[in-house]
Amino acid sequence: MRLLREASKLGPRLLQYNGVTRNKPLSLAFCRHCSSGIVPNERIRNIGISAHIDSGKTTLTERVLYYTGRIAHMHEVKGKDGVGAVMDSMELERQRGITIQSAATYTMWKDTNINIIDTPGHVDFTIEVERALRVLDGAVLVLCAVGGVQCQTMTVNRQMKRYNVPFLTFINKLDRMGSNPSRAVLQLRSKLNHNAAFIQIPIGVESKFKGIIDLVEERAMYFDGEFGQSVRYDDIPAEFRAEATDRRQELIESVANSDEILGEMFLEEKIPTVADLKPAIRRATLKRLFTPVLVGSALKNKGVQPLLDAVLEYLPNPSEVQNFAILNHENSEETSRILMKSDRDSSQPFVGLAFKLEAGRFGQLTYVRVYQGMLRKSDYIYNTRTGKKVRVQRLVCLHADIMEDIEEAYAGDICALFGIDCASGDTFTSKSNDNLSMESIHVPDPVISVSMKPTNKNDLDKFSKGISRFTREDPTFRVHYEVESKETIVSGMGELHLEIYAQRMEREYACPCVMGKPKVAFRETISNTAPFDFTHKKQSGGAGQYGKVIGFLEPLEPESYTKVEFEDKTVGTNVPKQFVPAVERGFREACEKGPLTGHKISGLRFVLEDGAHHMVDSNEISFIRAGEGALKQAMEKSTVCILEPIMSVEIVAPSEFQGPVIAGINRRHGVIVGQDGSDGYFTLYADVPLNDMFGYASELRSCTEGKGEYTMDYSRYQPCLPSTQEELINKYLEATGQLPAKKGKVKG
């Protein structure tokens, strides 16, 4: 303790301890345990910082680490010193000024341990946000005061809803020209359907932004000192008192609508005290019935400390979040959900989820969220998917790319293991007979593909090593070899996603790559129900092959266009039950290549109603072939159409360029779904086929004199235009040397 007291006097200067020079202050930020033992759940928060690209997430995280004593000096994302933010540890991130991988850290604020994951804002890296939100208890949604709710904000909102994550909203960049926090809150309500209200309002905006008003405590807050590190409280300025009173009343009404206790006080016309209001905000936020809105400017060092206070006051600790594991019963397809116990001791068996893999300097690094029990260094744990027993050789907690060894981790902790062979989404337990798995991470399907090959044929070994590592790390990065064209095809979430992997291949494996033209992940489907009655027979002397299947194919609803489903409606033993999985396997294998253009078949259901088998000749391979043949037969009887991915596109540009921008979207077969305008700028929302979006960045720069910008996010699949379908079929026929007359019929 004496050492810590002396260290605190030194502040951010270099410290020497046991002969080691540190460039960070020795502070309680490094302390994960209190004097009585283990940090209780009440003093732990696991949060993520998520937002649309360029909303200021990484800058905000940098300020959080500085004010909590975790780092000694702040650096900007694109600062003149060229150092870059601490959380952007990858060289490509510092070079481009964007976050590519989610980065984890932890810090202390008012004796509470806060684990933070800073996530990317670009739609191409959406899997990083997906798996971060899967393992976090709460989140901070950052909005730009100028842009408000944007494309990726909507995606993050859907992800938070999927995993039931409570969150605060922080409206950032109030110092920017055109900032309008009130508009951002209205968009939270109208676009995202949240019961949102200010718990703080700014004292001025743009160049007049001086501080914030706390509506709960009814006081003004100013941030003094060179880096805003000193918070000064004062009375609310006279010119803002009326607005503060109105906004506080609006806050009380919003919370009263979602909290029973405050609602009763509101009906009885009682004025709630701070002691009444804070617990009510917390209760409503934890149930996702209310969204507290805070304001500030991370770049100008204003509003960050009150945000940290709000994380402690309004976001849940691990014991307040229910996490379930799926128990698979032996000899049965039935499953049951088991509630994980968040006690921070060794009384319960260990259960953890590997949510992210990364190749570090010392081998594979596996990020794990501990959901139950305790994990010690040197413990043996079991991978429930593979059944393999592995030893925890090294246990670390992470601060961006800096690792700190720890001896143990408890329920509620986020840590990392070395040397563990696993895949993203695997569950680990301390018992070998546990047939448990944590509820899985949603992995979106890739929407774009390109061919990739090393520039030098001698680098094939390096290329295959890099591809192997990247596919293990990122479930949205897929690779397959195309036999017809003899090319390696990589698929991902967008052009930037695949471009980053090509650059990483050169930087990390010294293997420069050549990329082909992007290819869109089209799908094929049917537009009407079609029956099948297919018999597979093969006689070659001795035991032959025989399998007969009867049923029908039917199209799925548009929201299920990326799925294929199988339904067994057989009664009796005409198709023995042991052969039904073989029929499904044959059907799914045949869905890999459609009849029109060779793209995957999806958006349909295979319903098996009846069939026949032979006592001697029927076997598994017979019914696999029968399943394949049944699909082909039914598709020949049905009308086949091609599906294409549609992107939600958001374009922001000066108002004088509105005409050319709209004309450009119309040329690309886009459908305009909405429009906003303010302060000389307009925002256009449109649904555009991904196939028509290639090269749009340069067109937008050209028609707006470099002043326009756009973002896009995957929305859905829908049938493409007849002209597009005809063009795709002709290209496929040319590539395969077939004649159009031999092809299946075309829709429309």
Curated annotation (Swiss-Prot):
Compartments in which it is found: Mitochondrion
Binding site for GTP: 51-58, 118-122, 172-175
GO process terms (BP): mitochondrial translational elongation
GO cellular component: mitochondrion
InterPro entries: EFG_II, EFG_III, EFG_III/V, EFG_IV, EFG_V, EFG_V-like, EFTu-like_2, G_TR_CS
GO molecular function: GTP binding; GTPase activity; translation elongation factor activity
Catalyzed reaction equations: GTP + H2O = GDP + phosphate + H(+)
Residue interval of the organelle targeting sequence: 1-33
Domain tr-type G: from-to ranges: 42-319
Family named by the database record: Belongs to the TRAFAC class translation factor GTPase superfamily. Classic translation factor GTPase family. EF-G/EF-2 subfamily.
Stated name of the protein: Elongation factor G, mitochondrial
Source species of the chain: Xenopus laevis
UniProt lineage: Eukaryota, Metazoa, Chordata, Craniata, Vertebrata
